[in-house]
């Protein structure tokens, strides 16, 4: 049976590394439109863009997306989702999928998968996905978030650092990917129950979240179990920098 869920796409205009990121053109479309189109191809009952900027609202109206204007002072995309869940009147047990607004190549199957994974793992209050890291440059890239899970597929931690650090292997060959270590790249997509979002906001950011700039660490800090599935179809990395934007444009022939 198909899992019922709502997709919310948090989208901020301000970006330190790429100002105006959601409205950057890829071909003849703003990036936020490509993300929304991919989300609409999933099994979601509803797809909503959540933004703090009227310019993004106007752009969304131009291509037919439902968009909600939120406060500007949210600490993370998940905090923004909590406001939207309240405005939409979502039931506490409703599944909400957070699709990052800078993932224009995200496969619809991945969106469906993370929603289904949350529904299937009652011990987890959040679900997300990962894929193997297969080259040393990706492993050492701080824009690539690494994740380590336990034997039950629950997250132990996330970091922008090389995680885990293969002490002996790197001492011998510091520029070679160690064999036998299942390094994984975290894919920035989350599923949660709407009721959990309100708990998340009430906790406020923790120092670890602020240090790494990774909102999921707030959940781990408070003992929340996060299920990490192996993505059936992994997207290319999202858009964080001007170089990333050019990479996506090349991939799409734009």
Swiss-Prot record:
Molecular functions (GO terms): 3-deoxy-manno-octulosonate cytidylyltransferase activity
Subcellular location: Cytoplasm
Major site of localization recorded for this protein: cytoplasm
Enzyme Commission number: 2.7.7.38
Keyword Nucleotidyltransferase on entry: yes
Residue runs in coiled coils: none
Pathway where it operates: Nucleotide-sugar biosynthesis; CMP-3-deoxy-D-manno-octulosonate biosynthesis; CMP-3-deoxy-D-manno-octulosonate from 3-deoxy-D-manno-octulosonate and CTP: step 1/1; Bacterial outer membrane biogenesis; lipopolysaccharide biosynthesis
Biological role stated in the UniProt entry: Activates KDO (a required 8-carbon sugar) for incorporation into bacterial lipopolysaccharide in Gram-negative bacteria.
Family: Belongs to the KdsB family.
Name of the featured protein: 3-deoxy-manno-octulosonate cytidylyltransferase
Organism (species): Pseudomonas fluorescens (strain SBW25)
Gene giving rise to this polypeptide: kdsB
């Amino acid at each position: 049976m198909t899992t019922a869920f709502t997709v919310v796409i948090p989208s901020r205009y301000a970006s330190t590394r790429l100002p105006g990121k959601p409205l950057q053109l890829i071909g003849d479309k703003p990036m936020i439109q490509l993300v929304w189109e991919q989300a609409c191809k999933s099994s979601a009952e509803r797809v909503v863009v959540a933004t703090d900027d009227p310019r993004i609202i106007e752009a969304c109206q131009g291509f037919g997306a439902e968009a909600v204007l939120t406060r500007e002072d949210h600490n993370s995309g998940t905090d923004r989702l909590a406001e939207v869940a309240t405005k939409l009147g979502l039931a506490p047990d409703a599944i909400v999928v957070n699709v990052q607004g800078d993932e224009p190549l995200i496969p619809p199957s991945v969106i469906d998968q993370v929603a289904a994974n949350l529904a299937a793992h009652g011990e987890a209050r959040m679900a997300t996905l990962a894929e193997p890291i297969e080259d040393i440059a990706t492993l050492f890239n701080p824009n690539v978030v690494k994740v380590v899970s336990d034997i039950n597929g629950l997250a132990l931690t996330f970091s922008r650092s090389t995680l885990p650090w293969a002490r002996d292997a790197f001492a011998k060959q510091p520029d070679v990917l160690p064999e036998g270590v299942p390094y994984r790249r975290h894919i920035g997509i989350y599923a949660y129950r709407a009721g959990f979002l309100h708990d998340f906001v009430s906790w406020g950011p923790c120092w670890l979240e602020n240090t790494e700039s990774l909102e999921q660490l707030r959940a781990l800090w408070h003992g929340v179990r996060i299920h990490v599935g192996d993505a059936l179809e992994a997207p290319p990395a999202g858009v964080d920098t001007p170089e990333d934007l050019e990479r996506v444009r090349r991939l799409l022939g734009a």
